[in-house]
């Protein structure tokens, strides 16, 4: 029996795809990047040449309809995620869509309906849950190394963007709620919120507040919120993008110990309990999405369960909307 090959077509060829994700599609067994689409003809030709991709398109629908392609990777800004995903599903293609999955809960529900009404599969690129670093944290929790988790304290802070940075096309769209959903918070927080859902499961209640403090751009730049999980764990999170120093800190406090780690900076995981202190370090991944892409390819081939479903993406969108008052 011939093994199924996942032939990818990629819609969008921006900065995130250059190293984080794009090359990994060619390195995963049973996977190859067959085509790429970008509206700028010269840029898409250059991208295809540099990454040894045999086909290129300037029209997304033509890429979707290519009979050789059986899976679509959507790496555009979030305002078009659901548009391309629904079109791909209607064409019978499997879909791997970048985070945030869409712009709102309503659009997430429409995408979920499209998944259920078509044969194609869909996975969301909440890729940190497949990285060894975060799988280790999940294992430590499952092994009850800190007893029953009681509270999560997450703090995230970035320095304000410079005027030059705000004019950079790679950043500018992230600051427009119409394209990104809600600024830098919507760009980064999906990773953090998804990990909490991955670690702790069903969410019972969410409350939050967001505000535009600095007025540097349209989107809010400070967010604070709480999440109550079904297991009675309480999450407290704060995000600011106008700080004098950068902070990337998360603590999970249990009845018998504490786990401390970072979501983005790769600091060693620190475990403190009655047995003393332990530290766990991991090498940085060259292609940060490769473990997730391996899992998605296996799912599309029918070899495992979905590593991150549309329903899980919907739960993250519900939290993002609740924290920002949408």
What do the predicted segments below correspond to?
Residues 1-5, 31, 71-73, 109, ...:
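C-terminal helix-rich "cap/oligomerization" subdomain common to oxidoreductases
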Residues 46-53, 111-115:
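Short, conserved SAM-binding/catalytic segment
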Residues 71-78, 82-129, 144:
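Beta-strand-loop-alpha-helix segment that lines the small-molecule cofactor/substrate pocket
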Residues 127, 249-321:
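C-terminal glycine/acidic-rich active-site capping loop/insertion
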């Amino acid at each position: 029996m011939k093994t199924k090959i996942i032939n990818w077509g990629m819609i969008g060829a921006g900065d995130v795809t250059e190293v984080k994700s794009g090359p990994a599609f060619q390195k995963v067994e049973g996977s190859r990047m067959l085509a790429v689409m970008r509206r700028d003809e010269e840029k898409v030709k250059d991208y295809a040449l540099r990454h040894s991709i045999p086909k290129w398109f300037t029209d997304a629908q033509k890429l979707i309809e290519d009979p050789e392609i059986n899976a679509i990777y959507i790496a555009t800004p979030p305002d078009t995620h659901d548009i391309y995903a629904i079109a791909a599903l209607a064409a019978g293609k499997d879909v791997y869509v970048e985070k945030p999955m869409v712009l709102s809960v309503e659009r997430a529900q429409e995408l979920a309906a499209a998944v259920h009404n078509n044969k194609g599969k869909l996975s969301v690129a909440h890729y940190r849950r497949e990285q060894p670093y975060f799988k280790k944290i999940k294992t430590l929790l499952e092994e009850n190394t800190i007893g029953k988790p009681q509270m999560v304290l997450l703090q995230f802070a970035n320095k304000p963007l410079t005027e030059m940075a705000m004019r950079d096309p790679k950043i500018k769209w992230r600051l427009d709620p119409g394209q990104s959903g809600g600024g830098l918070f919507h760009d980064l927080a999906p990773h953090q919120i998804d990990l909490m859902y991955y670690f702790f499961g069903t969410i019972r209640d969410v409350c939050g507040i967001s505000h535009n403090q600095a007025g540097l751009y349209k989107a809010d730049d400070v967010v604070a919120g709480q999440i109550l999980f079904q297991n009675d764990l309480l999450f407290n999170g704060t995000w600011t993008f106008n700080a004098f120093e950068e902070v990337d800190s998360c603590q999970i406090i249990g009845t018998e110990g504490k786990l401390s780690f970072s979501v983005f900076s790769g600091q060693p995981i620190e475990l403190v309990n009655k047995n003393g202190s332990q530290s766990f370090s991991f090498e940085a991944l060259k292609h940060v999405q490769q473990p997730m892409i391996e899992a998605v390819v296996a799912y599309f081939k029918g070899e495992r369960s979905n590593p991150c479903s549309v329903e899980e993406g919907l739960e993250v969108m519900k939290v993002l909307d609740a924290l920002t008052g949408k």
